[in-house]
């Protein structure tokens, strides 16, 4: 039977197109007709600038045409994939999962790098407030006290800390991948909701869709921030807050360009 498209008039399908193709519509020997309906997936909240074909693109009005597989259905899709990393649907799904998980870890990590140093500069005592130096306290004579309190966790073995981290983080990731754990089962492994949404932020679908975009935007910034913190630690040997204070005090001599020239051959 030739492929055809018809609009159903019933309220349940009003305004939706139903496609009949040779593979989905066949006249059987008994004279019965078998049909399969195909309804397009929702593109996101109506009127949102972050979803759909008219969404915000990576270069705004100067953006070229987006690849056909980037339809604006998912949060954070700005229509840019020069390397074709999202062309395969399974790879795309896996990369989306990895990006969201790494974004969340990066946001926590960036906060952990900055906050102790801010507290230390405002009079709160730490054994070591700089993030990349804190772990080395475990090799000191007194070991490492979490939050400076020996009654919480008094660590003196790097192997014990490593094993504890593997067990705890492995358990959390195992529960996430399996979709079940002490807090119940989750249908969506990236956005489980339920006990993980005690404030009910995801109850409104349109607000939830906007929050997904905000999470990815902040997560991507956090991943770049963590990369910058690593580079700063290697080049200056200082934490991010101290580097910022040095730059504000003397921006001419304390900036990325000034430090980059230190690595020029022959200098």
UniProtKB/Swiss-Prot annotation:
Q: Which of this chain's residues are annotated to bind chlorophyll b 5?
A: 165, 263
Say where the protein is mainly found.
plastid
A cellular component term, taken from the record's GO annotations: chloroplast thylakoid membrane
Q: Where is the transit peptide?
A: 1-35
The positions annotated for binding chlorophyll a 3 are: 137, 147, 215
Note whether NAD occurs among the keywords.
no
- Residues that hold chlorophyll a 5 according to the record: 214, 232
Tell me the keywords, alphabetical order.
Answer: Acetylation, Chlorophyll, Chloroplast, Chromophore, Magnesium, Membrane, Metal-binding, Phosphoprotein, Photosynthesis, Photosystem I, Photosystem II, Plastid, Thylakoid, Transit peptide, Transmembrane, Transmembrane helix
InterPro entries named in the record: Chloro_AB-bd_pln, Chloroa_b-bind
Please indicate which superkingdom the organism of origin belongs to: Eukaryota
Q: Residues that bind chlorophyll b 1, according to the entry? A: 58
Which residues does the record give as chlorophyll a 1 binding sites? 80, 86, 99, 220
Binding, chlorophyll a 6: 247, 256
Provide the GO biological process annotations.
Answer: photosynthesis, light harvesting
Query: Which Pfam families did the record assign?
Result: Chloroa_b-bind
Which residues participate in chlorophyll a 4 binding? 218
Indicate how the chain sits in the lipid bilayer: Multi-pass membrane protein
Which residues make up the binding site for chlorophyll a 2? 102
Tell me the subunit arrangement. Answer: The LHC complex consists of chlorophyll a-b binding proteins.
| Listed name of the protein | Chlorophyll a-b binding protein 1, chloroplastic
Task: Give the species this sequence originates from.
Answer: Arabidopsis thaliana
Q: What is the lineage of its organism?
A: Eukaryota, Viridiplantae, Streptophyta, Embryophyta, Tracheophyta
**Chain's gene name:** LHCB1.3
């Amino acid at each position: 039977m030739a492929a055809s498209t018809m609009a159903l008039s019933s309220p349940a399908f009003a305004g939706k197109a139903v496609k009949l193709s040779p593979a989905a519509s066949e006249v059987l020997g008994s004279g019965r007709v078998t049909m399969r309906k195909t309804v397009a997936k929702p593109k996101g909240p109506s009127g949102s600038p972050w979803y759909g074909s008219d969404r915000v693109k990576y270069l705004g009005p100067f953006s070229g045409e987006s690849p056909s597989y980037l339809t604006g259905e998912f949060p954070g899709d700005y229509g840019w994939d020069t390397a074709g990393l999202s062309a395969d649907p399974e790879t795309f799904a896996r990369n989306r999962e990895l990006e969201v998980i790494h974004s969340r870890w990066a946001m926590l990590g960036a906060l952990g790098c900055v906050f102790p140093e801010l507290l230390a500069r405002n009079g709160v005592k730490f054994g070591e407030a700089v993030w990349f130096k804190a772990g080395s306290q475990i090799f000191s004579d007194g070991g490492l006290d979490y939050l400076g309190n020996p009654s919480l966790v008094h660590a003196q073995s790097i192997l014990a800390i490593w094993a504890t981290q593997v067990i705890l983080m492995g358990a959390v990731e195992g529960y996430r991948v399996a979709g079940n754990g002490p807090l119940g089962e989750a249908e969506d492994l990236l956005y489980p909701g339920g006990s993980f949404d005690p404030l009910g932020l995801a109850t409104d679908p349109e607000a939830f869709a906007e929050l997904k975009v905000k999470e990815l935007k902040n997560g991507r910034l956090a991943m770049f921030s963590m990369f910058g913190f690593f580079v700063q630690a290697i080049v200056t040997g200082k934490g991010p807050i101290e580097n910022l204070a040095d730059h504000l005090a003397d921006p001419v001599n304390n900036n990325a360009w000034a430090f980059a020239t230190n690595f020029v051959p022959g200098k």
